[in-house]
Amino acid sequence: MSHYRAKTALPLCALPFIFFSLSVAAAEAQVKIDTQVGFHGLFRLGYPFPLRVELANLGGVAQGILEVRVWKGGPARGVDLYPVYHRRRVLLPAQSRKSFQFTIDPDSVSRPLTLTFSGAGSRWSKEIDLRRHFSAAPLLVLVTENNFLPPLPVGPTFAGPLISLALGDLPADPRAYQGVSALVFYEQSLRDLSRRQLAALEGWLSSGGRMLILGSLHYALYQEAAMSRFLPVRVAGLKRFSALPDLDRRYGKAGAPLKDLWGQAARLVEGRAVLEDGGLPILVETDRGKGKVFYLAVDVGRPPLSRWEGLPALFRDLLASLPERSPTPQARWDDTVFSQLLATPSFISAYVPVRSFFLWTLFYLGGAGAVVWGWREHRLSRRKLALCFVLLNALASLGGYLYFSRRGNVPDGVLLTATLLDGSTGGYAEAQSNVALFSTQTRAYGVLVENGWSDLEALYPRPGTAAESAVVAEEEGSATRFSFPLSEWGYRLLRIRSQSLFPLGLELEDRGDRLTLRLNNRSAKDLTECWFVVRGQSFFLGDIARGSSLVREFAREAKAPASESQRPRLDLREIRFDNRLHEVLFRHSFFPDGQGLGRWSGDGALFFGWVREASPRVWTDDGHVLAYDYTLFRVIIPLDGGGDLDEG
């Protein structure tokens, strides 16, 4: 009997829980939006920065779209204002919180950011005034365990603010670090960093970032695999240094010298030891692409080094900004350049079915010829001739319209990408991609950009409404999708910068009477139609397959010119390629004469070649859009002196 009563009472006890669940599910969602701008509320003006958005759902289940509107363009950019919408599809359980990371890059802080969450007929929005958060100086970010702040003397030596950041707050996008001058690690384990965070740090370093790793007594933290990815040394343990005369001599003052301090015993793996003691590196500097990594073996957070008078001078050197690099000449597509590309026969054949159009023309001319023949031979009456002529034009017009607009292999659009890879040290190459999407139909289009890009600018060829010029950005795994509408026979231009690996070894040795060029293609791609330009002369090198090497010598025939005006200049438009579209892109895109890049003087040597079957950085998954991708790799080598050369 007791078993029967318990079995009967069980559903009755479950009724309150069922009614509570139904009431929560039926309740309307109440969403609250909280944000954190930049690094603890600060970002550097004119650079991308991270934005953390937290959605707190105080009601039932909510499903919708989180959107951040950013304004781009303006007079400073030379283009009209247009909005960029960063979107995420969100599912919020009842009574829950979720955080989302964005990297945004507004061109002006005068317009507020607008955050919107909309779904199921409800809409919540919030505006952020960016004028309260920006810093004109670069930021210095310190990452330590438990946000412990060591005594870093950066006041007079560094103009920007010092921000202490937790490891979990590091962004997972390399673009978010562009406003950071240096990233300092002290007594911090990196094993909890995600793969995306580690990849973001490496991408930021290779594009010009600076990382400072300060040693401490907790040497085991510096032996972890995650930290070893950035360290130029291998830490073995601790060592007590009785004195560091080289460090005292370089940075010390008239005070007492350093004595009896602890540091890490390490072995140099890469880079160079700026300071060492007894064969052990004390201060190490190494290059990572365009960036640098510094390692200091001694502990600056504990005495006696923390009270040392030479510490400000040491940090002045370590935190000094990287020297400005002279920008390499890079072409940018505009309406003039793209109009020239659009009018070339090689590009016209990409969106016009020439063979079908030729057959259609033959059909029309054949029909017209038959009508004329019937009129000349008096085989048809005037009424029948007129009827045949009208029917011929009607059939040709209607059939041509239906065939070429809906069938006939006429694409809805053509995506053309021209990428210029600028080789640099460490096997890295800066990629600048000029992208054009040409439309034959009025519809919305989408392009995918590989993650890791550092800058993107979407140009609209003519002034339009906000809806026509808007761009929607959505992250999709390892790529970012950019969507925008286009009218019939309209187009849109994109400029994208990124950093990638392309290990091509190039050495140019000047022996006085001759130059020796050594090339070693260590990349996974073949180079075709390679050229070498030096002192106003061009030399064809042919193809360089992956894994192969090439050595050429060029004999000097004359002395250097006496003045700058006497230096020979080569018109790069005289160089010919087997591929006609290669030639068009080379003339109008990579080295357009209208932008002052068509002539090459004797200021340096130039090597370039086409990358065969390059991995696309921009692509589309739309089957109705044809995609063409072309990549040119080049290296510019500074060269002093002059004289004509002859290939030896």
Question: What is each residue range found by the language model?
Answer:
Residues Y47-P50, S108-S189, S216-L217, V233, ...:
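Aromatic-Pro/Gly-enriched surface loop or interdomain linker
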Residues V61-G78, E529-S538:
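Short acidic, flexible loop segments centered on an aromatic residue
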Residues K72-S108, Q537-E564:
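Intrinsically disordered, low-complexity Pro/Gly/Ser/Thr-rich segments with frequent PxxP/GP/PP motifs
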Residues V154-T157, R175, F185-G278, L314:
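A glycine-rich, often tryptophan-bearing local segment used as a flexible ligand/cofactor-contacting loop or short
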Residues G179-V180, R210-M211, Q264-A370:
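A glycine-centered loop/beta-turn motif at secondary-structure junctions
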Residues L341-A350, L437-G648:
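Accessory, solvent-exposed terminal regions and/or long lumenal/extracellular loops of proteins
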Residues R382-R406:
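Internal/C-terminal transmembrane anchor helices
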Residues A386, F404-T425:
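Alpha-helical transmembrane signal-anchor/signal-peptide segments
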